[in-house]
Amino acid sequence: YSEGVEDETYLRGVQVVGKDGTVTFTSVVPGCYAGRWPHIHFEVFPDIGSITDATNAVLTSQIALSEEMANTVYKDSRYPDSATNMSQVTLETDNVFSDGVDMQMPKVSGSVAKGYTVTIDVPVDTSTEPTAAAAPGGAGGPGGVPGQ
């Protein structure tokens, strides 16, 4: 973590797309907090100079994680509360994904032992005017105890 956020429990990263329009992040499977389906937030900005101000985002969205992958990962003792939280939420009851998740569900391959690869295509028109709206939160909020 960068100076000043060493005690935070959320992950943040910034990437610039390559010439082919793709971006790659290496991360961990996030824990599942109460009331929310396991997910990853992301924002898209029209250019590198815009990334320091969230109101410049041309897209703010979330990626839902697969139930099979999450249930497998949450058997690990480093995710002590995630299995319970996951058992109490469905995609239909989640406050973001309940309106349909087809465009927010990535392809998943891999395993706990070898690691997972999660891929999703997100068409973006960078000429879109920023909407200055943040993604809705959940009952739990960002962070929390690592792995939970």
Task: Tell me what each language-model feature is.
Residues 1-90, 125-137, 141, 145:
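Beta-strand-dominated extracellular/periplasmic modules and repeats
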